[in-house]
Regions:
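Conserved Rossmann-fold cofactor-binding substructure of NAD(P)-dependent oxidoreductases
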Residues: 52-65
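Conserved anion/nucleotide-ligand pocket segment
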Residues: 132-146
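Rossmann-fold NAD(P)-binding glycine/threonine-rich loop
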Residues: 95-118
Length: 146
């Protein structure tokens, strides 16, 4: 069972934490833990901790024991936090869209020997990955998702 450390417990983040907690230990960090649903607060596989995602030292300390990190923060916060996660040597899935060029972090990821899956949000993120895969296998002329 993996130890998944998740930063961000908004509407989508809470849903992801519940899904992940079905087979893993989830450590969920957010600044607004009072706003988190009772379903999260009472889940036996989710540990809820107050973490200020804008405080890099708190983020670094929070993810220290993580097997993998899920970043689920608003896009304007994501780039700086993603850089910190990479520099801590943690594999990460980022479900946020970031206005910055994520490829600027590629060298950091290589140097820290980590895998970064970025822009992997529910939609359009995951459908883009699905489309990309199928487009390598066959010619796609139309693609719709709902």
């Amino acid at each position: 069972m993996a130890k998944i450390y998740q930063i961000g417990a908004g509407m989508i983040g809470q849903t992801m934490a519940l899904d992940l907690a079905e087979g893993h230990d989830v450590f969920l960090g957010d600044i607004n833990i009072d706003d988190v649903s009772d379903k999260i607060k009472n889940h036996s596989s989710i540990d809820l901790l107050k973490v200020d995602a804008q405080d890099i030292k708190q983020v670094s300390s929070f993810i220290l024991d993580a097997d993998i990190v899920l970043l689920a923060v608003p896009g304007h916060l994501g780039f700086k936090i993603l850089k910190t996660i990479i520099e801590c040597g943690k594999n990460v899935v980022d479900i946020s869209f970031s206005p910055e060029d994520i490829m600027d972090l590629n060298r950091n990821a290589i140097e820290n020997d980590v895998t970064v899956v970025f822009d992997a949000g529910v939609a359009p993120g995951i459908p883009n990955y699905i489309f990309g895969y199928h487009n390598t296998v066959e010619k796609i002329t139309s693609f719709k998702y709902f």
